[in-house]
UniProtKB/Swiss-Prot annotation:
Pfam family, one: TatA_B_E
NCBIfam families associated with the record: tatB (TIGR01410)
Subunit and partners: The Tat system comprises two distinct complexes: a TatABC complex, containing multiple copies of TatA, TatB and TatC subunits, and a separate TatA complex, containing only TatA subunits. Substrates initially bind to the TatABC complex, which probably triggers association of the separate TatA complex to form the active translocon.
Descriptive protein name: Sec-independent protein translocase protein TatB
Annotated Low complexity bias: 115-131
Region named Disordered: 86-131
Keywords, ordered alphabetically: Cell inner membrane, Cell membrane, Membrane, Protein transport, Translocation, Transmembrane, Transmembrane helix, Transport
Keyword Cell cycle: no
Major location (coarse): membrane
GO biological process: protein transport by the Tat complex
Transmembrane segments: 2-22
């Protein structure tokens, strides 16, 4: 815990603390300092553990990607075809829903479609007071 501090230094710190704080406040000061040290150690250990866990996850992820890329290259044609079919099925599920019954914009006659000129004119007329 105290790598660079020997017994004599600890004894000197204790005597100075006793003189400065007095016998009433010294035990509470020692408890609070030890709780701070404990909290800092706990925080440092949790950060270290979290970083190690993230590095392990990242390593596993990269290993999985490498194994997947090498494994897909060595597959038989039948397995490759089935994987392609599964990928196509997954893409079709991910596509947004498209309605086939609604006519496209090019099928609607021009007089039914509002143009930007008519909508601008309508907006300009709506700004004029009625009267």
């Amino acid at each position: 815990m105290f790598d660079g501090i020997g017994f004599m230094e600890l004894l000197l710190i204790g005597i100075v603390g006793l003189v400065v704080l007095g016998p009433e406040r010294l035990p509470t000061a020692v408890r609070s300092v030890s709780s701070w040290i404990r909290a800092m150690k706990k925080m440092a250990n949790s950060v270290k553990d979290e970083l190690e866990q993230e590095l392990k996850i990242e390593q596993l992820h990269s290993d999985l990607k490498n194994a997947e890329s090498q494994g897909l290259k060595n597959l038989s044609p039948e397995l490759q075809d089935s994987i392609n079919q599964l990928k196509e099925a997954a893409q079709s599920v991910n596509r947004p829903y498209q309605v086939e019954d609604v006519p496209a914009a090019k099928d609607v006659p021009a007089k039914e479609m509002p143009t930007s000129e008519t909508s601008t004119a309508t907006n300009a007329n709506s700004d004029k007071p009625n009267g």
